[in-house]
Amino acid sequence: MKKQPKMTAIALILSGISGLAYGHGYVSAVENGVAEGRVTLCKFAANGTGEKNTHCGAIQYEPQSVEGPDGFPVTGPRDGKIASAESALAAALDEQTADRWVKRPIQAGPQTFEWTFTANHVTKDWKYYITKPNWNPNQPLSRDAFDLNPFCVVEGNMVQPPKRVNHECIVPEREGYQVILAVWDVGDTAASFYNVIDVKFDGNGPVLPDWNPAGQIIPSMDLSIGDTVYTRVFDNEGENPAYRTELKIDSETLTKANQWSYALATKINQTQKQQRAGQLNGDQFVPVYGTNPIYLKEGSGLKSVEIGYQIEAPQPEYSLTVSGLAKEYEIGEQPIQLDLTLEAQGEMSAELTVYNHHQKPLASWSQAMTDGELKSVTLELSEAKAGHHMLVSRIKDRDGNLQDQQTLDFMLVEPQTPPTPGDYDFVFPNGLKEYVAGTKVLASDGAIYQCKPWPYSGYCQQWTSNATQYQPGTGSHWEMAWDKH
């Protein structure tokens, strides 16, 4: 009896600070969205089918961070760098072929596009562009590939949107594989966020109505000679081993992820009557050296397919605990120092880098760590300017392969002179019902905030212990109600 292997467990535990996220947003399909963005599918599985993009690089850990110069199409990212917005973190997104990325079904006409924000910046607008009917999907994305007249424009009115928004747009007529470019132009920086969305126009219904998508073969990792990859096919009663397809890795060629994905899809098509694998091409299922969707025959009684592995040499587990980071540091005469403690599980290389909001590195540290090792690390920042900063932690194995990456946010703040009672009207939330435009309150962060003029002044009174979004300085939407003094 074959056992389900224990796959690599990668954990990065960051303690001592809540994970406040300052950047920024991505195209999603959690509630109403018609399709997820390319970068979204690097981290999250597609709604309904479970498909994912692979080999995305470091951006898979930060899908909200595809940020680049604004002004598209006059300025903005260079041709060939549109998908990544010229961000080194997202460079893998610029790869472009007809079969490189998961494609989400779409139809022309009214459609809903959804954004999820980790930081809901004041917004100028959102614009949506689509590739031309005759674009070449095997060339890097350029301005020439797109119709540069946006098919949908949504005004942001220079206010903060909620953490999830829906845009109703009319999608133009197209056929086959197309790319939609969604651009979020934030109003409080000189940057925009760029998300490309890979879609496939399938007319008014599925190309092959007798086949239903039920899973996919994701080439997520290389294997070793002696390993086995196989399908796990489920019906209403659970897993049915009679429909399993196994592929033994018996050559060096088959150890490569794209190779075994292609070989397994080919074997499914050769041996299974109720299953097919590969990219749809007309009325054919064509295996590819990449992600291969799996389909089940209508009426077969089969429900879904997953991929299992029998790993001869279990992969090691890694975890890193980073503690000691404060929420904010006050700027003084001496350089800012971050005093951190690291604890490793597994043999690894740990890397820490501090960036300011503009991605300028201010401090770095890296060192090999052994299993169970505790280490104290002090990072001294090369400069200290008030605002948002990030501590980026990376785990690499002994071969230099990135295993995980996380970003933790903190603030540098100017020293404040303690306010006197004459500087404010109330200590928040005392006197809540008396707050009007111009009212000044002392907030929990020690700063003074003034209630905005009408029509925003009504938000100043909207607070309870269970609804704190407008709480000055700390609420998710406090800037809609208050000005900081």
UniProtKB/Swiss-Prot annotation:
GO terms for molecular function: chitin binding. InterPro entries: Cellulose/chitin-bd_N (IPR004302), GbpA_2 (IPR041029), GbpA_D3 (IPR054063), GlcNAc-bd_A (IPR020879), GlcNAc_Chitin_IntDeg (IPR051024), Ig_E-set (IPR014756). Coiled coil: none annotated. GO terms for cellular component: extracellular region. Its main location: secreted. Residues 437-478 form the Chitin-binding type-3 domain. It is found in: Secreted. Residues 24-201 form the Chitin-binding type-4 domain. Keywords: Chitin-binding, Secreted, Signal. Pfam families: GbpA_2 (PF18416), GbpA_D3 (PF21868), LPMO_10 (PF03067). The keyword DNA damage does not apply. The keyword Transcription regulation does not apply. Residues 1-23 form the signal peptide. Belongs to the GbpA family. Probably interacts with GlcNAc residues. May promote attachment to both epithelial cell surfaces and chitin. NCBIfam families: PRK13211.1 (NF009690). This is GlcNAc-binding protein A. It comes from Vibrio cholerae serotype O1 (strain M66-2). The gene is gbpA.
